[in-house]
UniProtKB/Swiss-Prot annotation:
CDD domains: ProRS_anticodon_zinc, ProRS_core_arch_euk
Reaction equations catalysed: tRNA(Pro) + L-proline + ATP = L-prolyl-tRNA(Pro) + AMP + diphosphate
Protein name: Proline--tRNA ligase
A Pfam family per the record: tRNA-synt_2b
Family per record: Belongs to the class-II aminoacyl-tRNA synthetase family. ProS type 3 subfamily.
Single GO MF annotation: proline-tRNA ligase activity
Top-level taxon of the source organism: Archaea
Signal found in the keyword field: no
Its biological purpose: Catalyzes the attachment of proline to tRNA(Pro) in a two-step reaction: proline is first activated by ATP to form Pro-AMP and then transferred to the acceptor end of tRNA(Pro).
Family matches, as SMART domains: ProRS-C_1
Organism: Sulfurisphaera tokodaii (strain DSM 16993 / JCM 10545 / NBRC 100140 / 7)
Cell compartments where the protein resides: Cytoplasm
Subunit note: Homodimer.
GO cellular component: aminoacyl-tRNA synthetase multienzyme complex; cytoplasm
Length: 483
């Protein structure tokens, strides 16, 4: 069955606002502080399921969860000069306690490298204690001066998972970067989110990092959104805090660090990438409700009561197998109204039970993603539901991956690159000489952002010329219109 996607594709921004509000996921724009939204119960459950997955992946790889204070003293935040230069225009400052002026300004945490390094200097004294891998899931605050957008560009990022690790050598930290990349690949793959992995250019790396690796995806309007970053911090922060440890050879030296984070954007992408004009199609992995059962009333009350009891029996069978299910037996709503509501909420499967199913001892199961339906014997319902949920998960990932790949275009012609970015957006890959000046000029002439060097493909550009200066190319460079 062909499913309409016109609103989703052509008016994505309005579609997302509509879905978040009407599906009761996230109330944005009405709370009286710009750039701050409210997680509603249904959305909060989606958020919990996403965080449960990332916690599992981090815990399994030796990370330990911590919780640091929200407030960071000004002198602590400014310890690493390059770092504060990258954030100083975005920091919220607390300057009063009640009516009293504070002796030291306190920042609302924009990120936690400085506060975590400060505390690590008390905790870690020897290479024997390494590696250390910490993470926390907290709110961070950044005074965004660009137009704010729900979940994607916020002043309070409420779902900020930041990991911070400590290592004896640069090479150990580099290996941790690789582990972090693999953790995020497993995370996004399980969620069905397609991604590109790029090494950010020097001018766009994290403030205070040796280098930054980023995960990006393409949204329905063909603009690109950053969904995760991994930073090799080297010794920048440990030197700033004069934090040394004893090494294996007995000498004292500054340890090396990494940090990596994801945010609310992951949930925005989960809602966005598999939508249609009926609403989102949630991946069963994170759907708070995997199955909704809608009893279809009969003409007489006695048969209707039997249908509802039948539906409850089917529901219990599903619950006993660990499948989250809701039975919508609200007498005030018609079946059509119920279908509309649960489609808008993106519930992966709907089971309809009416007089026909009651008489035939069957259930009618309908997929949210394709709207394809089939009758199944009641005693096979659990088995069929499990099969369909797995198929929906895989099909959604496959469709999203196809969508992304179709929007990555290679060209060796600068004018063509400009035209593609202007007319179609998506991602353009061009040959690049490696010179930062050429990269910055590319941003200017294309009115796009350089995402960096692809790390997830190895296209040979040895015979190509840089699109800007015509010198021999050293690598590909990705360009895109971004959020």
């Amino acid at each position: 069955m062909k499913v309409s996607k016109e609103k989703w594709e052509k008016n994505f921004s309005e579609w997302l606002d509509w879905v978040l509000r009407e599906a009761e996921i996230y109330d944005y724009g009405r709370y009286p502080v710009k750039g701050m939204g409210v997680w509603m119960p249904y959305g909060f459950k989606i958020r919990q399921n996403v965080l449960q997955l990332i916690r599992k992946l981090l815990d399994e790889t030796g990370h330990e969860e911590v919780l640091f204070p929200l407030l960071i003293p000004e002198d602590l935040l400014k310890k690493e000069s390059e770092h504060i230069r990258g954030f100083e225009e975005e920091v919220y400052w607390v300057t009063k306690g009640g009516s009293q002026d504070l002796d030291v300004k306190l920042a609302l945490r924009p990120t936690s490298e400085t506060s975590i390094t400060f505390m690590e200097s008390f905790w870690v004294k020897s290479y024997k204690q390494l590696p250390k891998k910490y993470y926390q899931i907290v709110s961070v605050f950044r005074y965004e001066t660009k137009a704010t957008r729900p979940m994607m560009r916020l002043r309070e990022i409420t779902t900020f998972k930041e990991a911070h690790t400590l290592h004896e050598t640069y090479e150990d930290a580099a290996r941790q970067v690789d582990e972090a990349i693999n953790i995020y690949k497993a995370f996004f793959d399980e969620l069905g989110i397609p991604y590109m992995i790029s090494k950010r250019p020097e001018w766009d790396k994290f403030a205070g990092a040796e280098y930054t690796i980023a995960f990006d995806t393409i949204l329905p309007d063909s603009r690109v959104l950053q969904i995760g970053t991994v930073h090799h911090l080297g010794q920048h922060f440990t030197k700033a805090f004069d934090f040394k440890i004893q090494r294996k050879d007995g000498s004292l030296d500054y340890p090396h660090q990494t940090s990596y984070g994801i945010s609310d954007r992951v949930i925005a992408v989960l809602i966005a990438i598999n939508g249609d004009d009926h609403g989102p199609v949630l991946n069963p992995v994170i759907a708070p409700i995997k199955v909704v059962i809608v009893p279809i009333p009969a003409k007489d009350e006695e048969t209707t009561a039997k249908i509802i009891n039948y539906a409850k029996e089917v529901g219990e069978n599903l619950k006993n197998r660990g499948i989250t299910v809701v039975i919508d037996d609200d007498k005030e709503k018609t079946p059509g109204e119920k279908f509309y509501i649960w489609e808008l909420k993106g519930v992966p499967l709907r089971i309809e039970i009416g007089p026909k199913e009651l008489n035939n001892n069957t259930v009618y199961i309908k997929r949210r993603d394709t709207f394809e339906g089939k009758s199944v014997p009641k005693d096979k319902a659990v088995e069929e539901v499990n099969t369909l949920l797995e198929k929906i998960k895989n099909d959604l990932h496959e469709k999203a991956l196809k969508f992304l790949k179709e929007r990555i275009i290679y060209t060796e012609d600068l004018n063509e690159a400009k035209k593609i970015l202007e007319e179609r957006a998506g991602v353009v890959e061009v040959p690049w000489c490696g010179d930062n000046n050429c990269g910055l000029q590319l941003q200017d002439v294309t009115n796009a952002r350089v995402l960096g060097i692809p790390l997830d493909e190895d296209k040979d550009v040895s015979n190509a010329k840089c699109v800007m200066c015509k010198k021999p190319a050293k690598s590909l460079l990705r360009l895109a219109k971004t959020y």
